[in-house]
């Protein structure tokens, strides 16, 4: 009897073992296949990445680092982590990489733990200007444990106010300055940030979670050699599994980072995720990834130009990377209402505050749109022009209806067009 139970444990499919979870996954697969994904922080991973993340590496505990584990039997997971480290170093041209952080928040926390003490002062981009929660938001640990000095964008053009950065740095003498964000669509001047950091004796940390794939693909300047340390997620524009990574050229910082990640913040790393990170980093080292990164930027610019041509304002006037913030006020819409209407039309995005937004954070005056997932799917400029026109069609219908319920007829018509478009670009056909 026990033998039969064991056989079932190792052989029963998910569909047989847990039909409720299987059903949810099947519905999510259908959603991803038929909807246009425009959330800037999302992407679509390869079959190889999926296979690595769903592998038997999930069974293995491996506290420590390759060659220095606190558990036995780590010789093969060591291979996976060593490959991830070496590929990360090669991809970004750095001397040290830690691939163990489980998330973007944890990678940033690890840098704080390595370089700061509670109560120290650091600077980061204000959340309302396109920063991240972990860059000092008062609701986040980073804003509770440290003295945070935020900088922002100029009100007239929504570009980074580097004069404000320099002035506040001189006044407040931060120990760390963070450059990088989640909703800033222009090129970052890493050199100027480093000059300011050096002037006040601060570390410069770059959070390139959103643009790492563009950096790797040659479409955005690298933060190295300007920054002391850089963090990035491995999903988003890198097209890997969800997780984090920390990079540096400084051996002393690398030692502090390693100690901060383990044992400072985490115990056993997720070896199946690290294996998948290695696969994604290997993919990003291929020549075709540069073509992908270039197409992402072309597609984002096409989408922004299409929306502008149809009467919408793009924050800062356009985009140099993979994303844009769309100011909806000319269409008399809020981000909350637009996100829901576009969702009903099978276009997925997220409501997002715009700089100096008069609306509440859960309502907002804008939406954030991104090109990475659609580009992975195979969309090029023609498809993103069509996507932009479909977005405008939904927003115009929403304006005409002037209701939270939206315009059912318009949304149904757009939904049919979206399905026709996505059917031309199938994904995961083997499933």
UniProtKB/Swiss-Prot annotation:
<keyword id="KW-0554">One-carbon metabolism</keyword>
<dbReference type="GO" id="GO:0019264">
    <property type="term" value="P:glycine biosynthetic process from serine"/>
</dbReference>
<dbReference type="InterPro" id="IPR015422">
    <property type="entry name" value="PyrdxlP-dep_Trfase_small"/>
</dbReference>
<comment type="subunit">
    <text>Homodimer.</text>
</comment>
<dbReference type="InterPro" id="IPR015421">
    <property type="entry name" value="PyrdxlP-dep_Trfase_major"/>
</dbReference>
<dbReference type="Pfam" id="PF00464">
    <property type="entry name" value="SHMT"/>
</dbReference>
<feature type="binding site">
    <location>
        <begin position="131"/>
        <end position="133"/>
    </location>
    <ligand>
        <name>(6S)-5,6,7,8-tetrahydrofolate</name>
    </ligand>
</feature>
<comment type="pathway">
    <text>Amino-acid biosynthesis; glycine biosynthesis; glycine from L-serine: step 1/1.</text>
</comment>
<feature type="site" description="Plays an important role in substrate specificity">
    <location>
        <position position="235"/>
    </location>
</feature>
<keyword id="KW-0808">Transferase</keyword>
<dbReference type="InterPro" id="IPR015424">
    <property type="entry name" value="PyrdxlP-dep_Trfase"/>
</dbReference>
<dbReference type="InterPro" id="IPR001085">
    <property type="entry name" value="Ser_HO-MeTrfase"/>
</dbReference>
<dbReference type="GO" id="GO:0030170">
    <property type="term" value="F:pyridoxal phosphate binding"/>
</dbReference>
<feature type="modified residue" description="N6-(pyridoxal phosphate)lysine">
    <location>
        <position position="236"/>
    </location>
</feature>
<dbReference type="InterPro" id="IPR049943">
    <property type="entry name" value="Ser_HO-MeTrfase-like"/>
</dbReference>
<comment type="function">
    <text>Catalyzes the reversible interconversion of serine and glycine with tetrahydrofolate (THF) serving as the one-carbon carrier. This reaction serves as the major source of one-carbon groups required for the biosynthesis of purines, thymidylate, methionine, and other important biomolecules. Also exhibits THF-independent aldolase activity toward beta-hydroxyamino acids, producing glycine and aldehydes, via a retro-aldol mechanism.</text>
</comment>
<dbReference type="GO" id="GO:0004372">
    <property type="term" value="F:glycine hydroxymethyltransferase activity"/>
</dbReference>
<dbReference type="GO" id="GO:0005829">
    <property type="term" value="C:cytosol"/>
</dbReference>
<comment type="pathway">
    <text>One-carbon metabolism; tetrahydrofolate interconversion.</text>
</comment>
<keyword id="KW-0663">Pyridoxal phosphate</keyword>
<feature type="binding site">
    <location>
        <position position="127"/>
    </location>
    <ligand>
        <name>(6S)-5,6,7,8-tetrahydrofolate</name>
    </ligand>
</feature>
<protein>
    <recommendedName>
        <fullName>Serine hydroxymethyltransferase 1</fullName>
        <ecNumber>2.1.2.1</ecNumber>
    </recommendedName>
</protein>
<dbReference type="GO" id="GO:0035999">
    <property type="term" value="P:tetrahydrofolate interconversion"/>
</dbReference>
<dbReference type="InterPro" id="IPR019798">
    <property type="entry name" value="Ser_HO-MeTrfase_PLP_BS"/>
</dbReference>
<keyword id="KW-0028">Amino-acid biosynthesis</keyword>
<comment type="similarity">
    <text>Belongs to the SHMT family.</text>
</comment>
<keyword id="KW-0963">Cytoplasm</keyword>
<feature type="binding site">
    <location>
        <position position="252"/>
    </location>
    <ligand>
        <name>(6S)-5,6,7,8-tetrahydrofolate</name>
    </ligand>
</feature>
<dbReference type="InterPro" id="IPR039429">
    <property type="entry name" value="SHMT-like_dom"/>
</dbReference>
């Amino acid at each position: 009897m026990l033998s039969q139970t064991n056989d079932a444990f190792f052989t029963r499919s998910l569909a047989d073992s847990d039909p409720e979870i299987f059903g949810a996954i099947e519905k999510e697969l259908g959603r991803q296949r038929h909807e246009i994904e425009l959330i800037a922080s999302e992407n679509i991973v390869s079959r190889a990445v999926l296979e690595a993340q769903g592998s038997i590496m999930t069974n293995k505990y491996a506290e420590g680092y390759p060659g220095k584990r606190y558990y036995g039997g780590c010789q093969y997971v060591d291979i996976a982590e060593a490959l991830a480290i070496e590929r990360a170093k090669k991809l970004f041209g750095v001397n040290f990489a830690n691939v163990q952080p489980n998330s973007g928040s944890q990678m940033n926390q690890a840098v704080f733990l390595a370089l700061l003490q509670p109560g120290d002062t650091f600077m980061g981009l204000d959340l309302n200007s396109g920063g991240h929660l972990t860059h000092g938001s008062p609701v986040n640990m980073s804003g509770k444990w440290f003295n945070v000095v935020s900088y922002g964008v100029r009100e007239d053009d929504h570009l980074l106010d580097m004069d404000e950065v320099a002035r506040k740095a001189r006044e407040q003498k931060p120990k760390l300055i963070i450059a990088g964000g989640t909703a800033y669509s222009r090129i970052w001047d890493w050199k100027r940030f480093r000059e300011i950091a050096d002037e006040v004796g601060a570390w410069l940390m770059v959070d390139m979670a959103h643009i790492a794939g563009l950096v790797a693909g040659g479409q955005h300047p690298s933060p190295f050699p300007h920054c002391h340390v850089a963090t990035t997620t491995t999903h988003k524009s890198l097209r890997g599994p969800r997780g984090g990574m920390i990079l540096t050229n400084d051996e002393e910082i690398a030692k502090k980072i390693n100690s901060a990640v383990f044992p400072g913040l985490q115990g056993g790393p997720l070896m199946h995720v690290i294996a998948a990170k290695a696969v994604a980093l290997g993919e990003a080292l291929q020549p075709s990834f540069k073509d992908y990164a270039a197409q992402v930027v072309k597609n984002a610019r096409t989408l922004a130009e299409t929306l502008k041509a149809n009467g919408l304002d793009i924050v800062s006037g356009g985009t140099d990377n993979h994303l844009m913030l769309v100011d909806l006020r000319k269409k008399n819409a809020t981000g909350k209402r637009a996100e829901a209407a576009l969702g009903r039309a099978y276009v997925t995005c997220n409501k997002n505050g715009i700089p100096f937004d008069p609306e509440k954070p859960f309502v907002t005056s804008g939406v954030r749109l991104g090109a990475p997932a659609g580009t992975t799917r195979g969309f090029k400029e023609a498809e993103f022009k069509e996507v932009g026109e479909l977005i405008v069609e939904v927003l115009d219908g929403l304006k005409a209806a002037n209701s939270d319920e939206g315009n059912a007829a318009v949304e149904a018509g757009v939904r049919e067009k979206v399905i026709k478009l996505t059917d031309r670009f199938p994904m995961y056909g083997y499933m």
